[in-house]
Amino acid sequence: MALKNLPSKLIKKLKAYDKKSDYSRITGIDDGEEETVLDLTVKKGMKDGWVGNFDGAYGTADRYSGNFNVNRFLDNSYTSIVGSRNNTNDGRGRWGGGNSGITTSTMGGVTFAWENGKPDYSAGLLKMGGNVRYSRTDSESENKTNQEMYLPGGKSQFSNSKSQGQNMNQNVNANFRLEWFPDSMTNILFRPNFSHSNGDNFSHNHSVTFNESPFEAGLTDPVEEYKTWADPNKIRVNGNERFNNGDSWNNNINGDLQVNRRLVVPGRNLTLNLGGSYSESNSKSYSRSLVNYYQRNGEKTATYQNTESPSKNYNYQGRLSYTEPILKGTVLQGSYQIQYRFQDSDREMMVYDQLEKALADHGLTDVTALDLYNGIYNGMDFSSYGIDLSNLVRDAQNSQYATYRELNQSVNLMLRHTSKFENGQELRFNAGVDFQPQRTDMEYQRGSVDTSIVRHIQNWAPRFNFRWKISDTSQLRVRYNGTMNQPSMVNLIEVMDTSNPLYVSTGNSGLKSSWSDRFNIDYNDYLTERQMGWNISAWGNINRRSISNATIYDTESGRSYSRPMNIDGSWNAGTWMGFNTAIGSKKSFNLHFNQNLNYSNNVGYISSNLDDGARQYIDGELDMNGLFSYMDRLGLLQKATTRSINLGENLRLNYRNDLLEVGVNGGMNYQHARNDMQQSGNRDTWMFNYGGNIVLNLPWNMQFSSDISQQSRRGYDDKSMNTNELIWNAQISQNFLKQKNATVSVQWFDILKQRSSISRNYSATNRSDTWTNAIHSYVMVHLIYRFNLMGNKEARAAGMGNMNGGWGGEGRGGWGGGRGGRF
């Protein structure tokens, strides 16, 4: 709970200190992973009471919001009940909702914590706690996307799409934690968890592909105009309309038991971990699509697909670790872990477009696939024709069955060292390596492939962590992690997926493992007397033999053929700097500045050079392996590279006194992208904003606040995305009742109705711009009530019980969790 939620009469003593991590507190080994916490000592008889708030709101455009939290404190326990529902795209609780589309979020839950009052880490100490949570989101979204794919020879393929969707997702989670110290040297920790989720979805997508920019050809809304457009230069490639709907569910239960024993020698520990999990899931989907190929004399492809994908997974594991002090401030830690994992998955795809042809071959020319789907002929017996309906509609090529049995082992060796100096400085570092042998047995069936594969691999994962604590407010940290990743077993099987008529994929038996190097450097400092602080960070990620999909694009049909391949040259790096300082003798002014600079080098393989030799593999019976072998042999697969720089800056200056707070701010984001294959992929995108804000604290417990900013975008092909938006928000609130613990407020968002949601993204081979719908402009009227009743009967009789606290603004609640120091 924030300090402002607690009346000062409750507090006997307050101190700040660096709380050690769970690992340090249990093992006695200082790992340097502290966090600064406030330790509150509450007056006798005052650790007993209720704290909470209620907030209800309704507004224009049928927007509404309601949330509450009620917290019960006793000497050795804490209970919290929270709940909310809104359709303002605010998920509350941080585990629901979203920012795209229009989302209605519902959540509720209970959190509790209890201990028996024994001193920390003493014999007989027992702690338990947990929570049960429910959340649901219902969303409606509309998206418009313009995409450009970079092709060899200075060419590009352009696609434009519009989509509408409805989604429902709900989750139930239950977590429990039990910790016991049978004696001062032994710690037992048990953590079981359960979760259930289910959802359903519907979407309608309409897209069109061109071999030249439709905007340069004169179209303003390509998706709406392409069907009736004369297309004098024949730039239309295909049009695709697709409907999807489906549902899914998942159940999971897991648990972890940890037993730690501190041995006689300080720093010597033995730890045993046992755990396991079991989950089941299923998803069903139905899709219908129609593709028109304009470069192929009006050829059309219609598909009707039903898919069901049940799966079952379980695993169990054990881990034994031992820590031995070898020198002063130095310990050596070793561990061994073994895990058995089972996964059984099935995908059954039923296709109705192939059924019509099969029935016609038996002389049933008047029975259509759509009639069968609609159930018109469900009661008809086709056995007299020698037809097994279930076999006819099963898409053997795209149905699959896979069973995995994995035996994973991990051997870890870690060296930890700490040096402490008289001036208060500390040096810490740990270095280690994981060796991870793995055996996987897979049984796989798909189309004509029915195989069993056994794979033995060995992964390595080195890591290094250095921390120099320069002072209580300043430190330097350096971290490095190396990771080896193996291709999935399915990616190694050369079997085709033709379920999408415009995107066909296959595996690659020649894939090799990939390697990633990641590093982070962080430095921060804070001058308490001057209230000045800064933080500087740098990071980088280098990928070797990264696995990326190589794409061959057919300019006649708009169809893509994809295969995973190893490729070198993918890396990215970035920096971030933040600075904050108070200004003036009274520290009334505050200056904040931050800047980020990111660079990415994305690589991929692509080709559109389909000569007569290549077309022999796709115009007849599709042969993906032959196609990629031919293109690779002749050097027709070209490496594409997109280099992009992203620069962001923000500056804010505030002035504050008891009456008002006023500020000005400005920011910009610049994206510079260059593609070595297509000059049209060389883009410069700008987003910049500037504005101000004011807060007035009026003498009759009224507060007025407002902010305004000019936000602009530049560099988009679709002129409607190059916007100038003046965003103005305002709020007025009034506290009332004797203790000022009730508030009524009026909020008006986007008063001028100009805000929109637009984004741009890059990869090695394409660029995409996306617009998403949302309700940005509305008025909300809030009624907020807060209460704070702390202290037992004796304390209240002494005059300390009527303490309605000074909670300000909307109380968002949250999931408590733990005692929060000694409160």
Where are these regions (language model features)?
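Short acidic/polar hinge/loop motifs at secondary-structure boundaries
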Residues: 1-19, 75-80
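Primarily recognizes Gram-negative and organellar outer-membrane beta-barrels
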Residues: 18-62, 76-823
